[in-house]
Amino acid sequence: MLAARLIILLSFYWLSASAIDPADPLFVDLPHGKIRGRDNGFYYSYESLPYAEPPVGELRFEAPQPYKQQWTDTFDATQPPVTCMQWNQFIFGDNKLAGVEDCLTVSIYKPKNTSQSSFPVVAHMHGGAFMFGEARQNGHENMMREGKLILVKISYRLGPLGFASTGDAGLSGNFGLKDQRLALLWIKQNIASFGGEPENIIVVGHSAGGASVHLQMLREDFAQVAKAGISFGGNAMDPWVIHQSARGRTFELGRIVGCGQASDSTELKNCLKSKPAGEIVSAVHSFLVFAYVPFAPFGPVVESPDAPEAFISQHPVDIIKSGKFAQVPWAVTYNTEDGGYNAAVLLEKQASSGRELIFDLNDHWFDWAPYLLFYRDSMTTIKDMDDYSRKLRQEYLGDRRFSVESYWDLQRLFTDILYKNATELALDLYRKHGKSPVYAFVYDNPANTGIGQFFSKRTDVHFGTVHGDEYFLIFENLARGPEMRSDEEIISRNFLNMINDFVVSGNGTMTFGNCVLQDNVGSNKFQLLSITKNGCENLQLESFP
């Protein structure tokens, strides 16, 4: 079905061949009518362009449908994209509900660069654990100032609205991934109208956005919509990506919002369609053990093979082993202290006691660890969970107690389990089963402020190079300070050039500064580029450090 839709959409490709009117580049003709963008000084923007019918009413919990409306008036593309409805971790306070249900849009940003008649294209998928986040959370001005690339930001369904699943055809799930896929088809079809090069599209994302890129690339037909991908700080091997107990969680969601009488998936879906979207999304708080833990109670699933328009029907590990995935260039990354994103909240001082939350782990480790580290659903018995929890604690802390002094070892545990080990696994699978180039880098250059300070609400702790420290040099984010150091400015420019050169490369080569990344496919050792404030260095490793 998805392949048929691709053929139908691409058959209309000629409709988007009309160029931007050189007399007024703010106006663009699309198959749905004319749009008007905005002049932002050194770039143009065309925001909030719908690529799908609103996923409301009978279209809630269904695969997205291509946008059909024809505009009689000029469409106002000057309004920033709305937030897809979510229970947002970044909102402090009890009520974390934000956004709207009708949110499936793309937003396009084009630099003013008269020396280029056309531009390679970066399709961007935001992060947020598949639960929260939005197209606006990452800036675009760094990329626009470089003046070499068109950027397209994709909005997609999140949380239970995007990923509730009963594991069968009745409520199959992965609606957020299917949104992303339809958006990529829209970009392929229409980007030429904005001066973009449809033959030179790369997909990038961070965290859940990086995992989304990887999941999109696990479809064999990915090469029909893009030529390469980069997964920053997240990939499909991460333990928080594929959910194994979605069915029970989705029926529990139904019970919470008043659909407990549903006897099967179809009844449950129909009942959930009748409930207010805000009520469904607000139910997320019932799945949290403490704070925002687990940070991804809903997410991608392996769908039943008989599900309508199934996105994936095998586990990513099995897909890669089968060789039936898109053989196109891919890069995957991690940071040396990625786990600070998840662990930093444990250093927040509690208002009631003035004591850090990390001390509570001494009494609650066996209860909380399976949720913090995402093995609650993969263990069959409580004994298995307790044994694994005990093993991890002994391996990383020995006989020491959880405390501020032992925080760095706990953060190292989080980094390994939630990010680094999965990157090593992905590379190992690709070097054995891949055919196109696969690259990897590790970033070690702490930002002055970042996610660690944000979630701990502290400035007196050094967290190292945490989640996002590299990505926010490409796409600005308020979690890190607005200013870049001189070394970060150089690194930012090298990252932007890396992306540009990767997308236009005819043979999939990748460079960073004066370093050429080495291909992992067919290699006996891991080929890993190390990036620090002092430059870059190619490493050949038996295992990750």
Curated annotation (Swiss-Prot):
* Primary location: secreted
The chain's disulfide connectivity reads 84-103, 259-271, 515-536
On whether NAD is a keyword of this UniProt record, the answer is: no
Give the signal peptide as a residue range, or say none if absent: 1-19
Which UniProt keywords are listed? Disulfide bond, Glycoprotein, Hydrolase, Secreted, Serine esterase, Signal
Molecular function GO labels: carboxylesterase activity
The family database entries (Gene3D superfamilies) matched by this protein are listed as:
alpha/beta hydrolase
Q: Which GO terms describe its cellular component?
A: extracellular region
InterPro entries given for it? Answer: AB_hydrolase_fold, CarbesteraseB, Carboxylesterase_B_AS, Carboxylesterase_B_CS
EC identifiers of the protein: 3.1.1.1
Asked if the Swiss-Prot or TrEMBL record annotates the protein with the keyword DNA damage, the reply is no
Annotated family: Belongs to the type-B carboxylesterase/lipase family.
PANTHER family to which the protein is assigned, alphabetical: CARBOXYLIC ESTER HYDROLASE
Name of this protein: Esterase-5C
State the species of origin.
Answer: Drosophila persimilis (Fruit fly)
The upper taxonomy is: Eukaryota, Metazoa, Ecdysozoa, Arthropoda, Hexapoda
